[in-house]
Regions:
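Acidic/glycine-rich beta-solenoid
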Residues: 1-260
Length: 267
């Protein structure tokens, strides 16, 4: 399994008997290689038949993942960096101790599972100190009860189809059902056009026009043209996907390749 681009093997994949990815080798520009190894069923309650990832390494860094008995992730550890998570009996995340961002975040929810608050503190695994940021969210009390109405003072409004018409103070215009046609900003508008299948094919923002191209339903590339006082500049981007359909690389202006690199959870 793998991927070949312009005659060069860019990705090779190996799987175990349960079709879980166990190894990936990516050949980057210049010929350097990145090898990702995936291990299942080696941490805490995980068994050999679990689909939950236990650890991942790429030759430079490694990540270990732990879970509770419901399958909720409880910690990610990479060297001295650690992020721990706490979930409630409804499997909702209620606390995140993020040693990477040096923040601890608490979450609360309403009876429908909508987040109602997000409170940020300095990082600690223990007792919380002075709050740094307090974000609140409100929702409709009737009808479509998961429609957010406000976030920290920003209002949200919707049309009859549930499309947001005001998003954090920014007006949005919709057409033909659920197709976003226009975003109205302080400096002007951003306009969108679609084909007969509903795929976005053009975006116009000021003096910049972006056209999108597809292979079936998959975005294969875009061309961005900007008109300026010194002439017109054109930028092209081609997208390449791996055998699993994930974005693998993009080619910028036909000559420079950039690669998507993921952690064990696909981020």
């Amino acid at each position: 399994y793998g991927l070949t681009v312009d005659g060069v093997t860019r990705q090779t994949l190996e799987y175990d008997a349960l079709s879980r990815r166990t190894k990936e080798v990516v050949t980057l520009s210049g010929g350097s290689k990145r090898e990702n190894l995936y291990v299942f069923g080696t941490i805490n309650h995980l068994t050999d038949t679990d689909s939950l990832l236990g650890s991942m390494s790429n030759g430079t860094d490694s990540w270990n993942y732990t879970y509770d008995n419901a399958g909720n992730i409880t910690a990610i550890t990479s060297g001295e960096k650690r992020i721990s998570y706490q979930s409630d009996e409804l499997n909702q995340l209620i606390r995140e101790n993020n040693g990477v961002l040096n923040e601890t975040i608490l979450y609360t929810y309403d009876a429908g599972g909508n987040m109602t608050s997000r409170k940020t503190y300095d990082y600690t695994e223990g007792t919380l100190q002075t709050i740094k940021k307090n974000e609140t969210f409100t929702y409709r009390s009737d009808g479509w009860k998961d429609q957010i109405l406000s976030w920290n003072g920003y209002r949200y409004t919707y049309d009859a189809g549930g499309n947001p018409t005001l998003l954090r103070g920014v007006p949005l215009t919709w057409g033909e059902g659920r197709r976003l046609k226009k975003v109205s900003l302080s400096w002007g508008t951003v306009d969108f056009a679609y084909d007969s299948d509903g795929k976005r094919v053009k975006k116009t923002s000021g003096n910049t026009e972006t056209k999108y191209y597809y292979n079936g339903s998959i975005l294969s590339g875009l061309v961005r043209t900007t008109a300026g006082s010194t002439g017109t500049t054109k930028t092209t981007v081609q997208f390449v996907y791996d055998a699993e359909g994930k974005p693998f690389m993009l080619r910028f202006n036909g000559k420079t390749d950039y690669f998507y690199l993921y952690n064990g959870l696909g981020d």
